[in-house]
């Protein structure tokens, strides 16, 4: 009886959110609110400028440092989020390359079923732990258990210091791939990108298509003009030039606040909903899941304001990528001492692609992701539309029962099986 009463809030929360969400969503998209949002952000920039001129310090930077230290300490002490054991095989500035293994300290390189490794590229926003939240809700474990040699890019806690442009992230993906190619003695690698990480993977594959065996995208933005989420509306109205001129960093707690502000009710109830989404009816597991999700939600690293500016202006505001007008600096090609500017043409992508779209995604609109397979030149391409939200794709019971087995099966069909001599 107690168990039944304990889990009835799941239905109540869903009903409560549904009945209040529509009106709040309308208000948060209104012209008045968007103008007030822009004015508010500009006032923060102006206030910080006055403080620096008159007092020689930035209260916003000081507050960010305090919040960051407090939450990092809290999260580290609260719960261990990493579930699947891994080794750090190399560190490039602040970026780490993780190599996952099974239940022992011996990596699976010699015993994996599939010879084609998989590199996971998470978004620069938040940390990668949401795709490895718990043993039975881990995307990493799904691939690992199926026999894939799994690697992960961990962008780190201090991205603002060493990743200043989109090019820097693309360069790190390339360096990671080169390291994995040498480690595994494989010419081509499977690539899986999530959210903004998926967008970065699209850019990478347009430049280095020949290095990739297949590409999995999950909730990846492409047609930003069609992204009608609240976050996208705010990005299009964000005074990013003024912010970039004043600050060197896009503070992590600013990003956390944006996720909260987009819909405080949903943001507050979602973590309860995700934690309650269990078929085991285990109160201990509910509390454990809630702690992990809460820790992840408040663990957003600072980004370089220069990178944030480029991503917002070139993609959210100008929509350059889908129109093949985005240009980035190649790290290797130099002309007269200058880095070579390369245009990103998505038609260069010819590899097999699986595009995973959440039909209820409120962070990346499905309309922004669905055009991916229409733009690339790949003949082997598939879209899976799943009745789920952005985070639910990663951790919901339904997704792990009905979505990820399909994804694993698709990747198995694109990967070579290891010979016994390997």
Model regions and ranges:
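Short, surface-exposed "cap/lid" segments of acyl-processing enzymes
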Residues: 82-84, 88-158
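Catalytic histidine-centered segment of alpha/beta-hydrolase-like enzymes
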Residues: 363, 383, 387-402
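Low-complexity, highly charged intrinsically disordered N-terminal segments
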Residues: 25, 29-107
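Short alpha-helix in the alpha/beta-hydrolase fold that links the catalytic acid
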Residues: 351, 365-374
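Alpha/beta-hydrolase-fold enzymes
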Residues: 1-46, 51-52, 182, 186, ...
């Amino acid at each position: 009886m107690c168990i039944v009463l304990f889990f009835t809030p799941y239905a109540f929360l869903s009903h409560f959110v549904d009945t209040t969400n529509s009106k709040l969503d309308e208000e948060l998209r209104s012209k008045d609110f968007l103008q007030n949002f822009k004015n508010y952000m500009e006032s923060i920039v102006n206030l910080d400028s006055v403080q620096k001129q008159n007092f020689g310090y930035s209260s916003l930077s000081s507050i960010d440092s305090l919040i960051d230290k407090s939450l990092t300490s809290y999260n580290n002490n609260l719960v261990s989020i990493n579930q699947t054991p891994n080794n750090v095989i190399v560190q490039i500035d602040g970026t780490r390359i993780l190599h996952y293994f099974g239940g022992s300290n011996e990596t699976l390189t010699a015993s994996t079923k599939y010879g084609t490794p998989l590199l996971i590229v998470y978004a620069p926003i938040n940390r990668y732990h949401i795709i490895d939240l718990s043993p039975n809700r881990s995307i990493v474990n799904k691939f690992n258990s199926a026999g894939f040699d799994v690697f992960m890019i961990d962008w780190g806690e201090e991205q603002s210091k060493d990743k200043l442009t989109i090019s820097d992230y693309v360069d790190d993906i390339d360096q990671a791939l080169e390291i994995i190619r040498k480690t595994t003695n494989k010419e081509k690698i499977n690539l899986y990108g999530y959210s903004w990480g998926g967008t970065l993977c699209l850019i990478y594959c347009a430049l280095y298509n020949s290095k990739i065996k297949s590409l999995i995208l999950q909730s990846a933005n492409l047609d930003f003009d069609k992204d009608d989420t609240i976050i996208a509306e705010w990005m299009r109205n964000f005074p990013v030039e003024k912010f970039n001129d004043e600050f060197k960093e896009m503070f992590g707690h600013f990003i956390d606040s944006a996720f909260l502000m987009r819909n405080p009710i949903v943001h507050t109830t979602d973590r309860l909903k995700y934690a309650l989404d269990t078929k085991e009816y285990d109160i201990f597991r509910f509390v454990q899941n809630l702690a992990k999700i809460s820790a992840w939600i408040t663990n957003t690293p600072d980004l370089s304001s220069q990178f944030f500016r480029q991503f917002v202006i070139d993609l959210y505001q100008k929509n350059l990528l889908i129109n093949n007008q985005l240009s980035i600096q190649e790290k290797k090609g130099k002309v007269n001492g200058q880095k070579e500017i390369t245009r990103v043409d998505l038609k260069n992508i010819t590899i097999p692609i699986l595009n995973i779209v959440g039909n209820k995604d409120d962070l990346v609109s499905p309309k922004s992701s669905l055009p991916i397979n229409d733009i690339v030149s790949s003949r082997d391409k598939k879209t899976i539309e799943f009745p789920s939200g952005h985070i639910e794709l990663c951790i919901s019971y339904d997704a792990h029962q009905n979505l990820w087995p399909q994804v694993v099966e698709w990747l198995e069909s694109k990967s070579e099986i290891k010979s016994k001599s390997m």
